[in-house]
Regions:
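A generic structural micro-feature
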Residues: 64-67, 150-156
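Conserved beta-strand-loop-alpha-helix junction that forms the acyl-donor binding cleft
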Residues: 106-115, 127-138
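Acyl-donor-binding surface of acyltransferase catalytic domains
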Residues: 143-146, 158-164
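Short hydrophobic/aromatic beta-strand or adjacent loop that forms the aromatic wall/cage
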Residues: 38-40, 154-159
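Conserved GNAT acetyl-CoA-binding A-motif
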Residues: 96-108
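Acetyl-CoA-dependent GNAT
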Residues: 4-80, 86-90, 95, 99, ...
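Conserved active-site tyrosine of GNAT-family acetyltransferases
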Residues: 119, 124
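Short, P/G- and charge-enriched loop/turn segments at secondary-structure junctions
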Residues: 28-30, 143-151
Length: 164
């Protein structure tokens, strides 16, 4: 069911990012990550993608000379409460360990309470708040909505980390 993204998946990956993320790029902490730059795993059943996780291995930890890290750039489950998101996250954790990463990290927005619950239940911790960072991201990607989940204004980025 879980398999690594392949080169042949790029077209479907771009379509997925367009549909679920408003375009083929993600903007976090002012940095652009294009869909064609990510690695990932997909949960596929009968040719249909039920889940997708993407990540980028980073040479150092936020430029401070630390150990290599793995940034989770997206996680989507189209069939909630079936363990798909957890299984995909476990696949990335295993991959990061194989590549000797010291930690995983990700950025989410202040409105994404579901993600905050999901990751913290799995041992991730909040490590940074970037106030008004989404305003800067909108300069790069204007399609980022002003209002998010539960009618919460989207303003801030939050960084979560998981030490390996």
């Amino acid at each position: 069911m879980i398999r690594r993204l392949a080169i042949a998946d790029r077209g479907m990956l771009l379509d997925f990012f367009e549909q679920h993320w408003g375009g083929p790029m993600m903007v976090t902490r002012g940095q652009i990550t294009h869909a064609d730059q990510v690695e990932g795993f997909v949960w596929e059943q009968a040719g249909e993608w039920l889940g997708l996780i993407t990540f980028v291995m980073r040479a150092d930890d936020h430029g401070d000379g630390g150990c290599a890290s793995c940034e989770v750039t997206s996680l989507d489950s189209m069939a909630e409460r079936r363990g798909i998101g957890s299984a995909l996250l476990d696949a990335v954790i295993a991959e990061a360990r194989l590549r000797s990463a010291a930690r995983l990290w990700l950025i989410t927005t202040n409105d994404n309470l579901h993600a905050l619950r999901f990751y913290q239940r799995r041992g991730w911790r909040l490590v940074a708040l970037y106030p008004e960072a989404v305003s800067a991201a909108r300069q790069i990607k204007p399609g980022i909505p002003l209002i998010g989940f539960d009618q919460i204004p989207i303003r801030d980025e939050l960084e979560l980390a998981f030490d390996l």
